[in-house]
Amino acid sequence: MSSSDSPQLHNIFVYGSFQEPDIIHVMLNRIPEIVSATLPGFKRFRLKGRLYPCIIPSENGEVHGKVLMGLTNDELENVDWVEGNEYERVFVEVVRKDNSEKMRVETYPWINKNDPDIGGEWDFEEWKRLHMKTFIEAFTEIMERKRNPQGKGRDDFSNVLKEEDPANAPSS
């Protein structure tokens, strides 16, 4: 097979829940090589009422995250499906933390930079402690239904991953 016949592979910078290998395994059915990296020129934010963050351009910002190395076109299609239409896949340059090399990768910034739901900083460790279990359970169910389309879809996944507003929670 010549190099022109080989499948195109993608390197994807992730900065939220997809930094967690267990979630990547659910989405891709494998854990690819993962390297730590920093994305300059962006800032990561919480999204009001949601269990996942967004990034938007910010001149002096930087986002710490991971690069998923060598994703196939089919795997990239899964990531696109999960990210939905509120994110846009774009090429960016990140700096690897292990060797300071720059890499051209793809990532998913939030499309609506003026979204009123954009809030304060999003913290990965806090998310793992408070929301990871719920996220993995919902994500596993949605990915299983995507592979065997007999029911819920991506919108159901988004609804499950919205945080409960304590003011609207039923009293016990």
From Swiss-Prot:
One of the record's GO cellular component terms: cytosol
Keyword Transferase among UniProt keywords: yes
Enzyme superclass (EC): transferase
Primary site of residence: membrane
Active site (record annotation): 83 (proton acceptor)
SUPFAM superfamilies for the chain: Gamma-glutamyl cyclotransferase-like
Record-annotated disulphide pairs: none
Entry's localization field: Cell membrane
UniProt tissue specificity: Expressed in flowerss, leaves, stems, seeds and roots.
Residues involved in substrate binding: 15-20
EC number: 2.3.2.-
Name recorded for this polypeptide: AIG2-like protein B
